[in-house]
Swiss-Prot record:
The lineage of its organism: Bacteria, Pseudomonadati, Pseudomonadota, Gammaproteobacteria, Enterobacterales. The modification N6-(pyridoxal phosphate)lysine is found at residue 51. The keyword Transport does not apply. SUPFAM superfamilies: Tryptophan synthase beta subunit-like PLP-dependent enzymes. This is D-cysteine desulfhydrase. It comes from the Bacteria. Its EC number is 4.4.1.15. InterPro entries: ACCD_DCysDesulf (IPR027278), D-Cys_desShydrase (IPR005966), D_Cys_desulphydr_bac (IPR023702), TrpB-like_PALP (IPR001926), TrpB-like_PALP_sf (IPR036052). Coiled coil: none annotated. It comes from Salmonella newport (strain SL254).
Length: 328
């Protein structure tokens, strides 16, 4: 099996059973295409989400190093920060979150509700900054300060998107391949592409397990020119760790994130409402709404390789719906 080196990495069991892979009959009828969904939004900790797959590897490494504090960074409404804080609480670890306000809003709902509300419930230590201009350096500076206070910190990068964290999505590709075997012949997979770890991990895994499947990353914060080098760098780092080659091209669509990261747009909000009304599935305004808008428009514009079944990776994020009201 090409991914056997995955077992070399310590892993903390946080998710348990594989997440569901479901057919969406009403959305499929609406779009005239078979649409499936990978439900990483229903992972079992703190309202779910995809970052738990990365945290299984990252937090295992933190515990191996003897850390008592997890430090990470993100937007005020970061799903990654929320899931990291929840795991820290579950394990009795301290959590420090370096947060920015990427949309510059003063709306109380955004500043206090949704994921931000949950951080307080998890007793997270909040550190605000004007902007995450160099998050790796900013996290290291924060870690040095926390260490001077007597803690043993472990830094988790933005989005959990290191080569180690992205192993969680190599593992997810294996899960998808097993769930689809003799059930559905996927043509394409669509995923939101942000901090790039989820996209890169899937790229490595699917290249070796389902090489005929087209993987599309819908960007949520950057142009193709900005995002592609980030995905490729992680793709190659992951492959190197697994003693694999990674030659698959990285496909990105950047038509759906404007006006910018964390700012809702009409197409994304229409996708949120469509999935809720047709399937009872909750997307979010920042990631999955925009990625689903790409899937819908991609079908309309015939951007996919063929007319076969499409799998949408639901990475979670529903808590942000409450913070973005009244946009919703």
């Amino acid at each position: 099996m090409p991914l056997h080196h995955l077992t070399r990495f310590p892993r903390l069991e946080l998710i348990g059973a594989p997440t569901p892979l479901e057919y969406l009959p009403r959305l499929s009828d609406y779009l005239g295409r078979e649409i499936y969904i990978k439900r990483d939004d229903v992972t079992p900790i703190a309202m779910g989400g995809n970052k738990l797959r990365k945290l299984e590897f990252l937090v295992a490494d933190a515990l191996r190093e003897g850390a008592d504090t997890l430090i990470t960074a993100g937007a005020i409404q970061s799903n990654h920060v929320r899931q990291t804080a929840a795991v820290a609480a579950k394990l009795g670890l301290h959590c420090v979150a370096l947060l920015e306000n990427p949309i510059g809003t003063t709306a109380e709902n955004y500043l206090t509700n949704g994921n931000r509300l949950l951080l307080d419930l998890f007793n997270t230590q909040i550190e605000m900054c004007d902007a995450l201009t160099d998050p790796d350096a900013q996290l290291q500076t924060l870690a040095t300060r926390i260490e001077a206070q007597g803690f043993r910190p472990y830094v988790i990068p933005v989005g959990g998107s290191s080569a180690l964290g992205a192993m969680g999505y190599v593992e997810s590709a294996l899960e998808i391949a097993q769930q689809c075997e003799e059930v559905v012949g996927l043509s394409s997979v669509v995923v939101a592409s942000g901090s790039a770890g989820t996209h890169a991990g899937l790229a490595v895994g699917l290249e070796h397990l389902m090489p005929d499947v087209e993987l599309i990353g819908v960007t949520v914060s950057r142009s193709v020119a900005e995002q592609k080098p980030k995905v490729i760098a992680l793709q190659q780092a992951i492959a190197g760790q697994l003693a694999l080659t990674a030659t698959a091209d990285i496909h990105l669509w950047d038509d759906y994130f404007a006006p910018g990261y964390g700012v809702p747009n009409d197409a994304g909000m229409e996708a949120v409402k469509l999935l809720a009304s047709l399937e009872g599935v909750l997307l979010d305004p920042v990631y999955t709404g925009k990625a689903m808008a790409g899937l819908i428009d991609g079908i309309s514009q015939k951007r996919f390789n063929d007319d076969g079944p499409i799998l949408f990776i639901h990475t979670g994020g529903a808590p942000a719906l409450f913070a973005y009201h009244p946009h919703v």
